[in-house]
Regions:
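Rossmann-fold cofactor-recognition segment
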Residues: 48-63
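Conserved glycine-rich cofactor-binding loop
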Residues: 10-11
Length: 252
């Protein structure tokens, strides 16, 4: 049985990956979807070209991993793609967020880094030559971001982990792609807060276009997927310009 697994599938980028995977893989038997909101996953069944298997649960808790592990060991599927899309951010200074709710920033590290790593390790034995791992990073991974400090740091981890893991798995024919979009018009900003930076407002992208580009890039074997000219310029700019200068420029 050929499957794909998508975390964070109930909304935003994860939901869009589920919608488009049926076009990317013509012969998928199932997509296994993971998120906390079961009712959203059930509604997604009508939007997918491929049958869905629902795993409703919190990636910060052990239960969903056990359910997934049991299903993988029972079915022994050919896992064609793992999409690690679960994650969240919160804007504001470290001190401001700390005063609002102590655990938000450590939860961010748990979900964006620890859960992504745990999902990857759990799924690795079921990947074969031609399989893909797509990890949702962010353009914030390219450079430190004041007032988005913890989120940007977690996405730097995702980018670094993805690129190094991709090199390790290259000889097995497994591609790992880090998706690094700028601001995307999703529910993400309902929790994180609306972007205040003018450039971020002007470069807001649509989720379907970002996901379409990501799937094209992973099919081409690219280690990093960056959507849109502004973010590509940002990507190359962070390689050429001092990060101290870029950090200060973000405050304009």
């Amino acid at each position: 049985m050929k499957i794909a697994i998508v975390t964070g599938a109930s909304s935003g980028m994860g939901r869009e990956f589920v919608r488009q995977l049926g076009y990317f893989y013509k012969n998928l038997d199932e997509i296994w979807v993971i998120a906390r909101r079961k009712e959203r996953l059930e509604a997604l069944v009508k939007e997918s070209r491929v049958p869905l298997r629902i795993f409703a649960g919190d990636l910060q808790k052990k239960k969903v991993y056990k359910e997934l592990r049991d299903a993988l060991e029972k079915e022994q599927p050919d896992l064609r793609m793992l999409v690690n899309s679960a994650g969240f951010g919160k804007s504001g200074s470290v001190e401001e967020i700390l005063s609002e709710k102590f655990r938000i920033q450590t939860d961010m590290v748990d979900v964006n880094c620890r859960s992504l790593t745990r999902m990857t390790l759990l799924c690795l034995p079921f990947l074969r030559a031609g399989s893909r791992i797509v990890n949702l990073a962010s353009a914030s991974a390219f450079c430190p971001q004041p007032y988005f400090s913890v989120y940007a740091a977690t996405k730097s981890y995702v980018l670094s982990f993805s690129r190094s893991l991709g090199e390790e798995l290259r000889k097995k024919g497994i591609v790992v792609t880090a998706v690094c979009p700028g601001p995307v018009d999703t529910e993400f900003f309902k929790f994180s807060g609306k972007p205040q930076n003018i450039l971020k407002k002007l470069t807001m992208a649509k989720a379907d276009r970002v996901v379409h580009q990501a799937l094209k890039d992973c099919r081409s074997g690219k280690s990093v997927s960056v959507y849109g000219i502004p973010m590509k310029l940002t990507y190359f700019g962070t390689k050429l310009l001092p990060h101290g200068f870029l950090v200060r420029m973000q405050q304009i």
